[in-house]
Amino acid sequence: MSYMETYKEWCTNPYFDENTKAELAAIGDDAAEIEDRFYRQLEFGTGGLRGVIGAGTNRMNIYTVRQATQGLANYILSQNGQEKGVAIAHDSRIMSTEFADEAALCLNANGIKAYVFDSLRPTPELSFAVRELGCISGIVITASHNPREYNGYKVYWEDGAQITPPHDKNILAEVAKVTSFDQVKTMKKEDAVAAGLYKVIGKEIDDRYMEELKKQSIHPEVIKEMAKDIKIVYTPLHGTGNLPVRRVLKELGFEQVYVVKEQELPDGNFPTVSYPNPESPKAFEFALKLAKEVDADIVLATDPDADRLGVYCKDTKTGEYVTFTGNMSGMLIAEYILREKKAMGTMPENPALVETIVTTDMAKAIAAAYNVKLIEVLTGFKYIGEQIKFFEQQHTYHYVFGLEESYGCLAGTYARDKDACVAVMMLCEVASWCKKHGKTLWDAMLDMYEKYGYYREGLETKTLKGIDGAAQIQSMMSEYRTNPPKELGGHRVLAVRDYKEDTRKDLVTGEVTKTGLPASNVLYYELSDNAWCCVRPSGTEPKIKYYFGVKGTSLADADAKLAALKEDLLK
């Protein structure tokens, strides 16, 4: 069926509601808009769905959510998981509540129990709930930090991590088989509740999740000692972090927590920030204003589903607030956990630190200093969560900490996804420890640069939208693969890792070895002088991403090297 035929079917078929038909009638004269909405089925990738909210097969709406859920239901039934059920959470975005209910009722119509949170919750709490309730799967309705017009649908498996092989490919195949809405089941909510299939969850899971968060604290006595002295500014950016973040800080004893009023309440329109991403300085505009008013030590922002954390810290020497990348905040927490566990004699046997391949190389230096195994995985926190499962199954290592450059980390194994709630808690504890010793977080970061080396990292993206953009991204990756550069930013290319082909080619010796990681469309260039660069298409947005890192003899030297590498990459 052509895209125009599909458009006409959506406009006339009684299966579709009147609001959907009205929205589509309004674009009847816009051929390009019709094509963009109907030229493909919204792709169910290895993590789930993500797209612009609206009518059409290439949009997030109740029909594409039902279709994806029917595929998931078919797979769950094939695994005899209907009695275990599925936990479902959602964030503050437009249509999130409706999409969560549609997913639940589709599962219910297939005889599968759904445990649905009574209101918005952080993504990591859903990860926790899957394991706590013994569910076979989990769904969270969120588009993370994307702009307001987006929403998404992420799928988790029974270990509490986002789906990984073989389940990701198997679920994807089942979703692809659902080619007609005649195959999609649903039922009325009151019938599902009466049948005991639709179950509401809330406070009891919140309480258990909160207890697990607090268990990750290493020095609660330091927090209590410094509780009156450390000033924290926090913004949930209109998302799910407000209640759990404030609760954990309060229960640990922090007394001076200032929340940005303008961004405190959940709002899927994100009225104060067009891009609710804690990686973006614009997201901190209100928080930094408040920080200056109250003379805060630390400024924190969580994204709408509270799995990523952005950080600013006051540099007392200049009076200015310094931004921390996800690499920097992750390293501060990693160093603190490893140092204090070693000092207290609580480091487990065979400890492991897990990071993604595009995360800072400083992690390798820290792991080596504490005799901790460093394990690298593909981009995506689901692969870090998967490692915890492997450790438990194979009795090899004990997970101590995991992090990725994109502002996500996890202390503890109560959840299997990145958790900004625990990251806030740990970073505030690190800040308390620093203040007790007459330092700031920035001082602690400078100490780490001095100890391990001046590692600096960058990320640049090129956005290429639509059909032409997708083809252009594919063409660029093909060109990088066929004709790899010999030099980047003044650094020689020493080796090329092609994760799609599972090869690492040493350009000096010509030797070819395996990467040992799952197949993924990622190219990684090992450069001279401890520099590196990695390029890959985004899994959730129409972008190609360039990650890069250097090591310098000082901050100025490292930043100059980083600028040269960036300039060369973006030519």
For the regions a language model picked out, list residue spans one by one:
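Phosphate-binding and adjacent anionic-ligand microenvironments
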Residues: 292, 296-298, 320-322, 340-536, ...
